[in-house]
Curated annotation (Swiss-Prot):
The lineage of its organism: Eukaryota, Metazoa, Chordata, Craniata, Vertebrata. It comes from Hydrophylax bahuvistara (Wide-spread fungoid frog). Expressed by the skin glands. GO terms for biological process: defense response; regulation of defense response to virus. It comes from the Eukaryota. The name urumin is given by authors from the word 'urumi', which is a deadly whip sword that originates from the same geographical region as H.bahuvistara. Changing F7A: Decrease in antiviral activity. It is found in: Secreted. Changing C16A: Decrease in antiviral activity. Transmembrane segments: none annotated. Its main location: secreted. This is Urumin. Amphibian peptide that shows viricidal activity against human H1N1 influenza A virus. It specifically targets the conserved stalk region of H1 hemagglutinin, and acts by actively destroying influenza virions. It shows a reduced activity on human H3N2 influenza A virus and no activity against other viruses (HIV, SIV, HSV-II, hepatitis C, Ebola, Zika, and Dengue viruses). In vivo, the peptide also protects mice infected with mouse-adapted influenza virus from lethal influenza infection. The peptide synthesized in D-amino acids is inactive. Keywords: Amphibian defense peptide, Antiviral protein, Pharmaceutical, Secreted.
Amino acid sequence: IPLRGAFINGRWDSQCHRFSNGAIACA
């Protein structure tokens, strides 16, 4: 289940999603 938002370069980006396999997808 992807989480809403992810830390990118130390900043929280609510448009990004971190998946359980470690992948990050940004809208």
